[in-house]
Amino acid sequence: MIEAPYLWRDAAHMTKAGSSPIFAKMNEELVSRRGLRMLAITYYGKRHLTTGSKEVRSAADMAGFKLRVPPVDTFRAMAEAWGARATPINFNELYLALSQGAVDGQENPLPTIHSAKLAEVQKYLVLTGHIITPRLVIANEAALKGLSAEDRAILDTAIANGAKWQDAELSRQEGDLIGTLKTAGMTIIEPDLESFRKPVLEQLPPKFEEKWGKGTWDALAAL
């Protein structure tokens, strides 16, 4: 659920969750079920909407819009809350699907939009910022337990420093990439953010409460 839309206020809020009791509980469940431990949450940017030919300035403009989403239930529910037609497509097929008009648009962080050259097949960049994207640093629990105290301390310090650098670097890149994508021919739109946010927050937390655990959303959102 840590990549759910509108869960995090900003990157600092997401990072703060990494040292919270509720995150510690989630971590122990991951260790128990998978033998893996989350060591850090890093920032990979805000996800934004892009469109091929339609100017989208509010969620009302999404009615009937064929939006490519990853094959993940929360992304599908988000698109449907906006009134769009959620269309799951694997990322390696996305460029072709956009170029052929199989879908009207997609959503991704700015580094992904740039590296995948989506400006070649999308005209508008709509700065929705609907998801603060996390990237997790995960390690095998058995391997961690095999480290000496000294080596574990070195590892933890390296991860903390790397995560801090990653967060700052991605923030810097985001500022640069809007200009880069504009230069590449995209039109930048600053939409009515509340029109996107409101229907998602009304629908998703109750819809996924059983899956996420009662009270989990509220606890994380309140940090």
Model-identified regions with their sequence ranges:
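N-terminal secretory/targeting leader peptides
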Residues: 1-13, 22, 28-223
